[in-house]
Every structure is written in structure tokens, then in C-alpha cells.
């Protein structure tokens, strides 16, 4: 979430504050089974009137003082850091961890830095970027002084009690820096997590096994594939190829259907309706044990416009939701479809976090056993088994815009793999009949 947007009660202008993320707000988020909150736009960035700034607020990724927080988020400028620390503490008391951004590749063109300021040796020759990143200057990692300063920045924020860092555009920084820095942070702060924004699957091995990252974005795999399937531009069976390419990295990939860089689900460039992507949500949450990220407002169907991270603005459904939270009824001012969508997200997240078969079990892809199945469209349905301690679920997603009645083959290999003894009702020769609503999914316990 961007606190300046999340807590903003004004339709035009204005900004949310640290204080708007109250214990009551956090309790509601915890009800959605959230484990960590990624607070975006915390560290001080360039704002309107400064060199090359985008929008009315500026980009959270054009940082101009790595040892400060944004003044506009505080009720009192002089107490801004204490207010952030109080937010971290409130979040922890609510049973969740705080994630903040670490932007290693670049800083704002007007970077000042109240501590350990950057000098010419810390910048790449040419300094400023062209095009979309024209408000930033690239850091020079051929200088070891840059490594030291960036490590010290990580240590500074880790000392605030945060649970982890979401690291921006990690592939633009040498993996050797991460190999050097991450173990030093983890030595002093065991348990702190590093999430990397990465887009090239061929680099995953290096950033996991050499760089030391705990999780990487799964944008180029599951996200891109599921988006194409929802739009009717790819086969549901393409999901198989994605998990096969990931291999053992599957549990370490961060799944999502929205973030600040991508279109909102209701956009015409994605699903056109938040309900049309529920089959993609089903697969993202239930296919494996990987973590899943929800972008603030996604659970209410915010959109179709992409939410600006560069402006002082607000989101109407979040304004109404926050108003309801203040009156001890978070659903009070939500529209019917928003409440309905939220209930679905909550039910899905309850299963994903609390059902041991889903949150701990392993997976058996059934697509290959149903390619020749005349009662199953492998281009528009996707099926798999989840297994844990003798319990087996059959999970089937339907990407069609209408309800379907399908029959699923479970091959002998699955019975052997899970040690299931066939019987009259469950065996490789009998297909299992399943009814699935449009753009949805079904879970059946079969053992």
C-alpha cells in the first residue's frame, strides 16, 4: 500500500498519514489473513517543484534522502521518524510484519542525504537516465564506497524493526553486491527477508543462490501467463510450462495479479471485471505454497484506471472502507459488488493461509492426463491435486465465461505418487465429475 493514498480521505488532493493506519485498520487487514504489509513511499523522495519530478507528489523511487521519511506522511514534521517507528510497532502488534522499499540502482537527481551523502564517485558517468527514469541518477557500483553506503542504509532501516525489504530492479545491480550485503544484514537481523523485483528467469538462480534473496517476483511467469489466459490469449495448459521452468524455485516466487507497475484487474487491458479474474486468483493462491501479494484496493475491485503513484490522490472505495472502519463496520459503505468480492478474497485467503493441504502440501499437475479428454477443455480449464499427510484435494479452475461440467482423469501415476489405494469410487479408470462456475474454481476433497 501507499500510505499517502490508502489513508487519504479527500477526493481531490490531500494525503494519507502514518496515523491513518490505525490499530483498527490493521485488525481488518489481519482478518484478510495478511502476514506482511509492504508500505511504499516511506523513504523521502523528491516532490513537486524539485528537479524532474513526476506528478504532484513525485515518484517513491526517486529517493532524495535515504535516512529520512516523507514529511507529508507525518502529523508533525519534527516527529516524522517516531511516527513511522510507531507504525512499525502497531503493525507488529497486529501480528504482521513491515516491508519497505530499498532502491539500489538509482536515486533522485537532487539527492542530498542527511547522512553519508553521495559524491561523484557514487554516480555512474552521465548520471541521469533518459526516458521514463529521467527523475533519477544511476549509482556506480564499480566504487566500493557505494557498496558500503548502500549496506549501511539497509542496516539503518533494519534497525527500525522492519521485517524485510522489497528491493527494486535488482537485476540492474551486480549480484556480487547482494552476495556481499545480504548476509551482513541477516547476521545482525536474523529472519529479515529480502524480496527482489526480477524479470529475467535466467537470472533467478544467481539471485537466489548467489545473491541470497528469499523471494523473487513471479511477473514473467505466472502473472504474465495467467493474464494472457484470462484474456483468452493463451491456453490454460501453459501454466504447466511455467511451474516446470521454475522447478524448486516455486515456493520462493512471489505471486500477484496486481501491483503498482501493472494494470488494475478491471482494466480493459486485463480482465475488464474483477470477477473475471477469480480463476486466476484461484490458481495463484492454491497451486503451490508460494506467497501471494494483494495490491491495496484489489480486494474491492478498484479500477479500471491504473492507480497513480506519482500524485496526491485517493481511491473512492478505500475512502468508504476507511470510513466504515472508523464506525466499527468496515463493510458499511461498500457497494454490493465490492462486499461480494471482498468476501471471496477473504474466503480464498482463509483457505490459502489456514488449510494445511494448501499452505503445506505438495502439488500434482493433472493437465497432461486430460489432453485427450473429450469432457474437459485443457485450454480453458486447469486441474491439479494438492496432498498433505494423507489428505488429497482435487482443484479445478475454469477460465470460461460460463459454468462448465467436466470430468477429470486422475492417472495411475498420481495414485502411486501419493500412495493412494484405488477403490470403487476413486481409481484411474473412473473420471471424477466436477461442476465449476464461470471464471471460478472448485476444490473437492477426494481422499
Show the residue positions of the predicted features.
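Substrate-binding cleft of secreted/luminal carbohydrate-active enzymes
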Residues: 281-303
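Substrate-binding/active-site clefts of carbohydrate-active enzymes
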Residues: 2-160, 181-189, 203-205
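Solvent-exposed beta-hairpin/edge-strand motifs
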Residues: 410-425
Amino acid at each position: 500500500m501507499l500510505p499517502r493514498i490508502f489513508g487519504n480521505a479527500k477526493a481531490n488532493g490531500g494525503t494519507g498519514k502514518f496515523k491513518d493506519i490505525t490499530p483498527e485498520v490493521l485488525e481488518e487487514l489481519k482478518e484478510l489473513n495478511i502476514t506482511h504489509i509492504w508500505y511504499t513511499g516511506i523513504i523521502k523522495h523528491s516532490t513537486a517543484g524539485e528537479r524532474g519530478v513526476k506528478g504532484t507528489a513525485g515518484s517513491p523511487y526517486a529517493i532524495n534522502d535515504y535516512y529520512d521519511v516523507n514529511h507529508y506522511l507525518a502529523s508533525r514534521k519534527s516527529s516524522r521518524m517516531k511516527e513511522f517507528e510507531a507504525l512499525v510497532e502497531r503493525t507488529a502488534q497486529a501480528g504482521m510484519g513491515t516491508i519497505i522499499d530499498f532502491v539500489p540502482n538509482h536515486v533522485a537527481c537532487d539527492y542530498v542525504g542527511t547522512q553519508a551523502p553521495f559524491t561523484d564517485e557514487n554516480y555512474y558517468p552521465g548520471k541521469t537516465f533518459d526516458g521514463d527514469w529521467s527523475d533519477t541518477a544511476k549509482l556506480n557500483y564499480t566504487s566500493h564506497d557505494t557498496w558500503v553506503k548502500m549496506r549501511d542504509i539497509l542496516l539503518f532501516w533494519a534497525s527500525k524493526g522492519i521485517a524485510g525489504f522489497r528491493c527494486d530492479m535488482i537485476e540492474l545491480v551486480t549480484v556480487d553486491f547482494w552476495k556481499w550485503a545480504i548476509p551482513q544484514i541477516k547476521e545482525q537481523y536474523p529472519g529479515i527477508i529480502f524480496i527482489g523485483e526480477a524479470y529475467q528467469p535466467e537470472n533467478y538462480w544467481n539471485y537466489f543462490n548467489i545473491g541470497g534473496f528469499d523471494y523473487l517476483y513471479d511477473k514473467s511467469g505466472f502473472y504474465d501467463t495467467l493474464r494472457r489466459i484470462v484474456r483468452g490469449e493463451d491456453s490454460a495448459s501453459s501454466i504447466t510450462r511455467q511451474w516446470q521452468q521454475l522447478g524448486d524455485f516455486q515456493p520462493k516466487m512471489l505471486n500477484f495479479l496486481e501491483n503498482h507497475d501493472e494494470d488494475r484487474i478491471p482494466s480493459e487491458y486485463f480482465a475488464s471485471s474483477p470477477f473475471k479474474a477469480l480463476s486466476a486468483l484461484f490458481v495463484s493462491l492454491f497451486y503451490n505454497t508460494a506467497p501471494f501479494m494483494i495490491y491495496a484496493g484489489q480486494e474491492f475491485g478498484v479500477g479500471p484506471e491504473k492507480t497513480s503513484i506519482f500524485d496526491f490522490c485517493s481511491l473512492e472505495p478505500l475512502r468508504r472502507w476507511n470510513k466504515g472502519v472508523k464506525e466499527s463496520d468496515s463493510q458499511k459503505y461498500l457497494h454490493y459488488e465490492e462486499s461480494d468480492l471482498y468476501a471471496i478474497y477473504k474466503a480464498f485467503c482463509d483457505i490459502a493461509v489456514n488449510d494445511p493441504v494448501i499452505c503445506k502440501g505438495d502439488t500434482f499437475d493433472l493437465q497432461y492426463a486430460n489432453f485427450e479428454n473429450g469432457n474437459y477443455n485443457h485450454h480453458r480449464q486447469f486441474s491439479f491435486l494438492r496432498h498433505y499427510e494423507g489428505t488429497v484435494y482435487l482443484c479445478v479452475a475454469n477460465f470460461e465465461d460460463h459454468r462448465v461440467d467436466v470430468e477429470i482423469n486422475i492417472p495411475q501415476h498420481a495414485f502411486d505418487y501419493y500412495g493412494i489405494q484405488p477403490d470403487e469410487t476413486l481409481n484411474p479408470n473412473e473420471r471424477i465429475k466436477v461442476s465449476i462456475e464461470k471464471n471460478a474454481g472448485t476444490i473437492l476433497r477426494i481422499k
